[in-house]
């Protein structure tokens, strides 16, 4: 797909993560399983974006209760292709998904999780 296409996986069950990684290899997308200790890092750093450095902080909170997937460096066609192939592969869905943007690139993973979880709860009640 593209050299910059990258998907970050947070608290994704190992078997499912392996399925996603296999799909991504076929599509030319890099993947990273983000460790709990890195949840306090900025998304730009976790996605390997130039100009972001690891901060001297370590996450001390609990594991996220839900899985989260963050897309970086993927245009809408790439994202659509990935999601279509994801469904075809019968990989169980991940409820919390986000695209890295100029706005949220400076957020910490834990902040994005909280925001997505709130939004997900609102949509579940609708």
Task: Label the model's feature ranges.
Residues 58-89:
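Mid-chain, well-packed structural core segment of small domains
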Residues 10, 68, 72-73, 98-102:
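Short, charged/polar micro-motifs that form catalytic or ligand-binding hotspots
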Residues 1-50:
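N-terminal, charge-rich interaction modules
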Residues 22-31, 51-62, 96-103:
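Charged, low-complexity, helix/coiled-coil-prone segments
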Residues 39-68:
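Short, intrinsically disordered low-complexity segments
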Residues 47-54, 72-78, 108-117:
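Noncatalytic linker/hinge segments flanking ATPase motor cores
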Residues 6-7, 18-19, 32, 79-125:
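Helix-rich interaction surfaces within compact, conserved domain-sized segments
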């Amino acid at each position: 797909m593209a050299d910059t296409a990258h998907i970050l996986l947070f608290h994704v069950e190992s078997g499912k993560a392996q399925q996603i990684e296999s799909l991504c290899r076929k599509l030319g997308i890099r993947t990273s399983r983000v460790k709990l200790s890195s949840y306090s890092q900025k998304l730009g750093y976790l996605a390997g974006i130039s100009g972001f450095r690891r901060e001297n902080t370590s996450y001390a909170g609990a594991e996220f209760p839900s899985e989260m997937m963050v897309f970086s460096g993927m245009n809408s066609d790439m994202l659509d292709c990935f999601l279509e192939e994801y469904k075809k592969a019968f990989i169980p869905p991940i409820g919390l998904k986000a695209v890295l943007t100029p706005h949220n690139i400076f957020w910490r993973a834990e902040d994005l999780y909280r925001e997505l979880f709130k939004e997900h709860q609102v949509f579940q009640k609708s």
